[in-house]
């Protein structure tokens, strides 16, 4: 597609240009909001605490909130409650018959499910905000602890999360790219310069050897190249169309291919898995020594870098890869039905149910490779990060999110440019047709 798309046409594509400016405007609003603090926070104590937690769980949480958690901004919870609510609603949609029926009702059913997701977001954000407010008080990071602080903190953080959810939905509908993914993407990219400065300052002070610095740089470059290769990898399923007759016209049969990505779920499984595993860490981060025996035990076994954490990370990535693919991004039954309606078929496979079973079999095998790729990209740098204490922004999850979102956004821009070029060609052909008719009418009659 890139070869057929002229980037010079960007200036003429008014709708695309407006979408890009709209997206940039909303993302700027998001970044400004990360610097607005929650009322009642002791800024000096918070900065001192976050300096000690920057390379640990604090750095991980800051990655998903664009640094807002480290500054205790109004967007400190980030978009994670919305993602968690989406996971729960999608799981329930597959298990509850009423929700499954809503899913099949088209646009109206989708709106109803989105409404349930918003209710779930408010509920989860309220729980997390209250837990975070209590943890801040326990960690002596509040100037005036008490009921008023907890209430104001909960209202502020829940309002910030709902505003981010609205920003993401508006970006998806009226801008470019997936709004939720772009919010996480911008948060990661905005914090990378500070992480790099911290990383190289550790090298200058001798805390990290030059060999480790070179190794991390090489690892990041190799990871980026590997992610780009795997995200562009496709399995093409051959589709045949028979010869058919409509009235007096005979249409010749043809063939095409159905492209299936090696990683159809994209970056969603990594985001889902990370958001769920970080729920207990969000509460325990600011609690100091008052964590409690239960939470201390959980963090001892399920903290980042621990064997059980890594094991559950892999299991969740594999699970969400299959779950998201077959429930959202690629539904074999719907694809088989569409092929049947278009008189298309897979050679050697009967249309309908047999085609759906074949597609499910093929995609399941592809997903085995795709989920293994996701787990490797997210897991191996995580192990190295735990051993070498490098900033989390150089980890596999952050690299995967940045590369995947960049590629998806560029692809959407190219699609809009290509559509604009086709619209221009159609308008030119229509104008040429009208001018020829006018010339024919004005031609003088022969005597």
Regions found by a protein language model. Give the residues of each.
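N-terminal cationic and glycine-rich segments that engage phosphates or anionic surfaces
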Residues: 1-103, 107-447
């Amino acid at each position: 597609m890139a070869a057929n798309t002229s980037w010079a046409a960007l200036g003429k594509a008014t709708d695309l240009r407006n979408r890009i400016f709209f997206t940039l405007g909303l993302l700027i609003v998001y970044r400004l909001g990360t610097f607005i603090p929650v009322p009642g926070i002791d800024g000096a104590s918070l900065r001192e605490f976050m300096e000690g937690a920057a390379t640990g769980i604090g750095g991980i949480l800051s990655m998903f909130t664009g640094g807002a958690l480290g500054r205790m901004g109004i967007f400190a919870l980030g978009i994670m409650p919305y993602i968690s609510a989406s996971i729960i609603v999608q799981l329930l949609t597959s298990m509850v018959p009423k929700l499954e029926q809503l899913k099949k009702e088209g646009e109206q059913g989708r709106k109803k499910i989105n409404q349930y997701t918003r209710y779930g977001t408010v509920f989860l954000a309220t729980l997390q905000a209250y837990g975070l407010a209590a943890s801040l008080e326990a960690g002596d990071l509040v100037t005036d602890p008490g009921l008023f602080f907890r209430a104001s903190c909960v209202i502020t953080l829940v309002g910030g999360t709902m505003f981010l959810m609205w920003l993401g939905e508006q970006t998806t509908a009226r801008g470019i790219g997936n709004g939720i993914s772009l919010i996480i993407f911008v948060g990661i990219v905005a914090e990378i310069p500070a992480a790099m400065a911290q990383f190289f300052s550790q090298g200058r002070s001798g805390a990290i050897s030059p060999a480790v610095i070179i190794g991390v740089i090489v690892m990041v470059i190799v990871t980026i190249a590997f992610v780009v290769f795997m995200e562009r990898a496709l399995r093409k399923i051959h589709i045949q169309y028979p010869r058919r007759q409509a009235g007096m016209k005979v249409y010749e049969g043809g063939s095409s291919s159905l492209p299936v990505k090696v990683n159809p779920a994209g970056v969603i499984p990594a985001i889902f898995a990370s958001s769920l595993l970080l729920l207990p860490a969000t509460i325990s981060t600011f609690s100091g020594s008052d964590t409690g025996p239960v939470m201390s035990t959980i963090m001892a076994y399920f903290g980042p870098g621990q064997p059980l954490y890594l094991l559950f990370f892999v299991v969740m990535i594999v699970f969400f890869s299959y779950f998201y693919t077959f429930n959202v991004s690629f539904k074999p039954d719907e694809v088989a039905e569409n092929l049947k309606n278009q008189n298309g078929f897979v050679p050697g496979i009967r249309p309908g149910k047999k085609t759906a079973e074949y597609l499910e079999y093929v995609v399941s095998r592809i997903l085995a490779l795709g989920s293994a790729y996701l787990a490797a990209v997210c897991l191996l740098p995580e192990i190295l990060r735990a051993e070498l204490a490098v900033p989390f922004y150089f980890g596999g999850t952050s690299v995967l999110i940045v590369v995947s979102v960049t590629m998806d956004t560029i692809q959407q821009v190219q699609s809009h440019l290509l559509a604009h070029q086709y619209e221009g060609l159609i308008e030119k052909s229509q104008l040429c047709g009208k001018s020829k008719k006018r010339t024919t009418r004005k031609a003088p009659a022969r005597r």
